[in-house]
Regions:
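Divalent-metal-activated hydrolytic enzyme cores
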Residues: 5, 22-28, 44-88, 114, ...
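Gly/Ser/Thr-rich loops at beta-strand to alpha-helix junctions
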Residues: 101-102, 151-156
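Active-site cofactor/substrate anionic-group-binding motifs, chiefly glycine-
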Residues: 99-102, 106-124, 129
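N-terminal secretory signal peptides
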Residues: 1-16
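Short beta-strand segments
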Residues: 96-98, 120, 147-151, 230-235
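N-terminal twin-arginine translocation
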Residues: 15-20, 31-47
Length: 244
């Protein structure tokens, strides 16, 4: 018999069980809502011209870079795109770029809004946040191409060289950043040619491979031929991109 109501067949859940149930229900509902919203993003195709194969996407970037180099960039009508892009996005390329203020991927490839999915960090290296961002791009936005874009005279790579060769000490969180870049420096020390240029190229190459293999989400798309991961080095003098 229940001591609370006198009903011999009544079963009352303790308060903590009801709270746990409500909490679980709320989490489940939130998870379902998030999943629906993420999958809904993949259904929005505001720019049909961005539905490309990996090779077509790379060719389009190369064409845009040539226009940028020669100063014949397209006129982008942002006003006409606003309504469509307010409802979703389907970028045809994801770019991991250095945070250097002299590098602007949207300009370098002569693209409009909604064309590029850009992540930027000094030294253009991969980490969990960058990888998760590109997982989202390929899984839910259908992005067919990922590019690791380094650039000549990169200050972050130069600092990594100084920490390796000279034992330079850096303040704050900079040492953690250097740990991401020093493997590239160590791999090219002793090689012929300019150390900084070699380290910049190697840093791009290492991060291309890491992006390909660090996560089963991206690697699956790469293995199926639905996504390509490439690297490039941006030239400050003329704006050209050397593809690696």
């Amino acid at each position: 018999m229940c001591t609370k109501c006198g009903n011999p067949e009544a079963i009352h859940l303790p308060a903590y069980s009801r709270r746990s149930f409500l909490k679980f229900s709320g989490v489940a509902a939130l998870g379902a809502a998030v999943s629906r919203s993420l999958f809904a993003a993949s259904d929005e195709k505001p720019k049909p011209q961005n539905e490309l194969t990996p090779d077509e996407a790379l060719h389009r970037l190369k064409q845009g870079n040539q226009r940028y180099i020669h100063g014949v960039m397209k006129r982008h009508d942002f006003a006409a795109e606003r309504a469509a892009l307010a409802g979703g996005q389907n970028p045809y390329a994801g770019i991991l770029s250095c945070a250097d203020s002299r590098i602007a991927p949207e300009y370098a490839f002569d693209t409009g809004r909604g064309d590029l999915f850009v992540a930027r960090v000094a030294g253009n290296f991969t980490n969990e946040d960058v990888i998760a961002s590109f997982e989202y791009a390929v899984q839910f936005l259908g992005t067919p191409l990922l590019v690791v874009l380094g650039h000549e005279k990169c200050g972050a790579v130069d600092a990594a060289i100084k920490t390796v060769k000279d034992g330079a000490k850096l303040p704050g969180h900079l040492p953690a950043m250097m740990k991401k870049i020093t493997p590239a420096v160590q791999d090219v020390i002793g090689q012929p040619g300019d150390l900084l240029a070699n380290a910049i190229r190697k840093n791009v190459m290492l991060n291309v491979e890491h992006l390909k293999n660090a996560t089963p989400v991206i690697s699956k798309f790469v293995e199926e031929g639905k996504v390509k991961v490439v690297g490039g080095v941006y030239r400050l003098e003329d704006g050209s991109v050397e593809w690696i």
